Amino acid sequence: MPVLSEDSGLHETLALLTSQLRPDSNHREEMGFLRDVFSEKSLSYLMKIHEKLRYYERQSPTPVLHSAMALAEDVMEELQAASVHSDERELLQLLSTPHLRAVLMVHDTVAQKNFDPVLPPLPDNIDEDFEEESVKIVRLVKNKEPLGATIRRDEHSGAVVVARIMRGGAADRSGLVHVGDELREVNGIAVLHKRPDEISQILAQSQGSITLKIIPATQEEDRFKDSKVFMRALFHYDPREDRAIPCQEAGLPFQRRQVLEVVSQDDPTWWQAKRVGDTNLRAGLIPSKQFQERRLSYRRTTGTLPSPQNFKKPPYDQPCDKETCDCDGYFKGHYVAGLRRSFRLGCRERLGGSQEAKVPTGAESQVLLTYEEVARYQHQPGERPRLVVLIGSLGAHLHELKQRVVAEDPQQFAVAVPHTTRPRKSHERDGVEYHFVSKQAFEADVHHNKFLEHGEYKENLYGTSLEAIQAVMAKNKVCLVDVEPEALRHLRTPEFKPYVIFVKPAIQERRKTPPVSPDSEDIASSLDEQQQEMAASAAFIDQHYGHLIDTVLVRQDLQEPAASSELS
């Protein structure tokens, strides 16, 4: 085996060791790793630098002069005063060059060992267990968007700390700012003795890039977990009117029935969410489900939130003598045009006199409307179509709407055939216009909860059964069904996956024109009353059942026909 001399450098030693490595059956991978490491060019360069430094230490050169720059300046003064020979001019020009002057200045700095700034001495009473705070300089680039972080003053230490990181904001995208970090400076401005609102103003006025001096939190919280939960809002929310929100500017306003993507539930009181379909990728604060339920429960207990039974009864729910219907009419051999109105009239005949408003009662009335978890619906091949449920206020004329939809595309849409105890007429066919059944069979089906809803009109029973709806869906057609709003809870099942459409007529203010005759004045007055009843009916349904509605359809074309039919 070759023997190395004492003067052999580390580079030669490693090179010789590499050549002497022999593969071992037990350590073949380790030997290959060492051979690869020792063969790297970067390691070879480092070894050469190491040898040069060791050589410098052994030589230990000492500077001949500690002020070469001062000597050069003295020589330059002598040359300027001396005779002007070519050699003297050349030396003067050489000593005046910036590069040589810089070399001499570096020489003096090294000779004088002027390497580091002189730090003040440590105080005598320093705590031995004191740990130096690590300061982090963070530079963020943002346009006109907010920083995406909220701050607060710590009650115990008085420091300004990061309270919340908003998902999708500049701070979140950087990954350099965390909850609990202490903020010391913003763009060189100390913020320790400033109020949080003053600091927010400084941050808002900073455009382009912003530099933060931060002391990291002692225990950094984990990064946000990927949380994608979709919630449908069942109430309107405006953060500007919420005095409990930590930061109104960070709040996310939304309307009832909007779908929200909840991206963070770390805070049990305030969630972070985005509106689905919104181009703004930054999340905002919304009250959590638990917090909103507590708040609504408190308001209901203290009387600031009226319970559903306390709402004023709408005018449309009063008995109306002018409303008439011929339930014998039918829609092209498939559905009775006036069936929905016959149910209403039948209920009025049975109850008699004035009615109470059909508000939710029992456990349903005590439900606190906050959020409803939803999932994006994607129709799968071979899956039955969703059930389309129509509910309407006065003047909606749902039967005409269904007639128009089915007539335009009878291969895709259909309606459920209702049941009745009325005797069959000569032109009617069982299972087409109606399912004609006996009163005993009808009442038995009612007892077994086979009907979605049912009613009595002129001593005859009418009803829409769940089996009739299922029969339409089994044909791979979209079933259109109109029901009273209180029947919606029976249809909200995984089997039907109902899509609920609230249909209401357009209500427009009547132009104030002088009446031509007393008769025209009476007609105009009747129209105004009907418009008010329609508006009250729509408001009542939206107030009590709006959380069950998916979309609202305003019918512009049926306003005048509805008014004329009511007057006839």
Swiss-Prot record:
CDD domains: GMPK, PDZ_MPP3-MPP4-MPP7-like, SH3_MPP3. It holds the Pfam family L27. InterPro entries: GK/Ca_channel_bsu, Guanylate_kin-like_dom, Guanylate_kinase_CS, L27_C, L27_dom, L27_dom_sf, MAGUK, MPP3_SH3. Its main location: membrane. The keyword Membrane applies. SMART domains: GuKc, L27, PDZ, SH3. The keyword Membrane applies. One of its GO terms (cellular component) is adherens junction. Keywords: Cell junction, Cell membrane, Membrane, Phosphoprotein, Repeat, SH3 domain. Residues 385-568 form the Guanylate kinase-like domain. Expressed in brain, skeletal muscle, testis, kidney, and lung. It comes from the Eukaryota. The modification Phosphoserine is found at residue 307. Disruption phenotype: Conditional knockout mice Mpp3 in retina develop late onset retinal degeneration, with sporadic foci of rosette formation in the central part of the retina which is accelerated by exposure to moderate levels of white light. Conditional knockout mice Mpp3 during cortical development result in a gradual loss of the apical complex proteins and a disruption of adherens junctions. Signal peptide: none annotated. PROSITE patterns: GUANYLATE_KINASE_1 (PS00856), GUANYLATE_KINASE_2 (PS50052), L27 (PS51022), PDZ (PS50106), SH3 (PS50002). Belongs to the MAGUK family. Interacts with HTR2C; this interaction stabilizes the receptor at the plasma membrane and prevents the desensitization of the HTR2C receptor-mediated calcium response. Interacts with HTR2A. Interacts with HTR4. Interacts (via PDZ domain) with CADM1 (via C-terminus)Interacts (via PDZ domain) with CADM1; this interaction connects CADM1 with DLG1. Interacts (via Guanylate kinase-like domain) with PALS1. Participates in cell spreading through the phosphoinositide-3-kinase (PI3K) pathway by connecting CADM1 to DLG1 and the regulatory subunit of phosphoinositide-3-kinase (PI3K). Stabilizes HTR2C at the plasma membrane and prevents its desensitization. May participates in the maintenance of adherens junctions. This is MAGUK p55 subfamily member 3. It comes from Mus musculus (Mouse).
